Amino acid sequence: MKKNPLFPQIKGIMHGGDYNPEQWLDRPDILEEDIRLMKQAGMTSATLGVFSWAVYEPREGEFHFDWLKDIMDRLYENGIYTILATPSGARPAWLDEKYPEALRVDSYGVRAHHGVRHNHCMSSPVYREKVRTVTDKLVSHVGNHPGLLMWHISNEFGGECYCPLCVNRFREYLADKFDHDISKLNHAWWTTFWSHTYNDFSQIEPPYQNGEYSIMGLNLEWKRFTTYNMTDYMKSEISFLREKTPSIPITTNFMTLYGGLDYHVMAKELDVISWDSYAPFHNDYESLWDTFAANAFSHAHMRSMKKGTPFMLMESAPGLVNWQPYNKLRRPGIHALESLQAVACGSDTVQYFQWRKGRGSFEQYHGAVVDHLGTNDTRIFKEVAALGRDLLKLTGVSGTIVPSKIAILYDWDIRWAVEDMKGLASSTKRYVETCVGFYKEFLKMGVDPDIISCDHDLQEYDVIVAPMLYLVKDGLGERLARFVKGGGQLLATYLTGYVNADTLCFLGGFPGDGLSEVFGIVSEEIDTLYPSDTNVVLFEDGRKGTVRDYAEVLRVGTASVLGSYTSDYYAEGAAVTVNRYGDGSAYYIAARLDMDALRPLFLEILKKAGIPTLDLPEGVEYHCRAGEGETYHFYLNTSDHVQTVSGVHGKNLLDNETVDGVLKLEKYKAAIVQVL
């Protein structure tokens, strides 16, 4: 595996964050102090211009960029590179006053007023024109600056717009998709139900809250269109920058598992994947390990969208945030641990929002490296500076990747369809939580799965895990069959193969699209359990597992039964099966079982695939990065006491000590062991 460092001009892992000097232009002393403190903290980059439009262009056609060039000059002179954002994430008041069509319309048909952010219409020609104008001026002033490292498109894309422009684009999108044949759309959406048949594409409206939202196909296509329209807007910014500065890479910052956009679609247009990580550490509903593991799922998801290339941790909070229900401070050591987790999972950067806390407005209490106190002797500043010194030791890690031969399917189409389906129990569907739960169980065994969409190349892997594969896209059934027939190990669960890409139920039995043959079973019924209901599955080896929420009743064909229900009318019926198919095996878990009961099954699957596991102490997380013959093992202790890990050999890059057999990990500490 060849190393592919994102920024070879930077030593170690890049260290930086959002910097907002436009808030301090009246305080040159603070701007000067910022440079001094950045160097002390080991900063090698700064993200500028995310919300600077009103300073760039305070009145229409009046531009001011000298201050920006001055800041970039000073940063570069002090060894700090610039990631420069296009300013489209928030608009100046003059734009909304003169061009109200740039404001979004909500799902009740009400147009927004000026304010907050992310409420611009992506279809608006005038908005696109004004963004291009200010970006053109920006490029002409600093596009050739030697310190310019990367373009950061807008900020945290999200939301949707129901204005007439977007409605018309939606109709055009549907007409193109269904070959301008309204009868095809009517069939795909099953509109004869409730007499909702359309005569023309002009009759179709998006799913307004006070309108039509009862058609599953409509709701899903609106979600897909929102991604299409957002991506089209993003591409308008990207294409302009690629024309003007072709050598500068481009990213935009994603938001963990945000439900409003299909990041797999957007990722195809970007050079590098980046995201903003704000895990709710120290909450009262899960262990610290669980919080870290859920965060690792998001990291794995981000890295998997650009296989073979590191991703970027674009934002994180060294102290706390100000928008969660409870904004608890990270305890000493946690910030460094979560930052090194990002590196362990494949990031080549550690970056923050924000460098310095502002004096007012919405994020004045959001965590920052420099607090309102403004000094370098706070706990958080000292922790950030110590981390900066550690990141300098990881030059060899930069550009390596996380090798994985196992993948979990996580797909926005499935998520949207499951969340919108009218059935089961709305409060216990938990598609995202189920995917994360499977990831956590493998992570406990020292196995770090990739997180991929259903469109990804399955042949890269030896094991595919497909939780709640409710919607089967065109061709996926055939691809999964080919994967198993060729020797792959496939694991699926209840609610697999119920509907096609239009949300129409398959006929002839679930799972559809040929998957019943692959798994050797047919699901005849699915039982939804009340929160107080349980069942029990008895496995062949005598162990038992508790069933909650959902239990399918199976008709077994060619599959072998590994576990059976013990109560209710489906007692002794199959609950867990395996089917030999070609050179591989297809496992089916028909009920929502506790993960402890499934662990032996997972170990069996991994053993068949030749994927090694580790016996890790509870609370210790493991990851691996490799490239060009070098291998780095990451061990993270999320527990509040000392842990030891056996079988570790190499050099710990953080303390330069040789490890020969037993690794000792202090509370909330990490070790990065290079194999010698």
Where are these regions (language model features)?
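Carbohydrate-binding surfaces of carbohydrate-active enzymes
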Residues: 201-204, 235, 247, 267, ...
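N-terminal carbohydrate-binding accessory modules
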Residues: 1-45, 58, 73, 397
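Conserved, mostly hydrophobic/aromatic
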Residues: 17, 38, 46, 75, ...
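The substrate-binding groove and active-site-proximal loops of carbohydrate-active enzymes
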Residues: 15-25, 51-66, 113-132, 154-161, ...
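Aromatic-lined substrate-binding rim segments of carbohydrate-active enzymes
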Residues: 32-40, 47-110, 139, 237-244, ...
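Short, acidic/polar
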Residues: 24-40, 132-137, 255-265, 331-339
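Short, well-ordered coil/turn segments that N-cap beta-strands
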Residues: 11-15, 42-44, 76-82, 144-149, ...
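Polysaccharide-binding and catalytic clefts of secreted carbohydrate-active enzymes
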Residues: 109-297
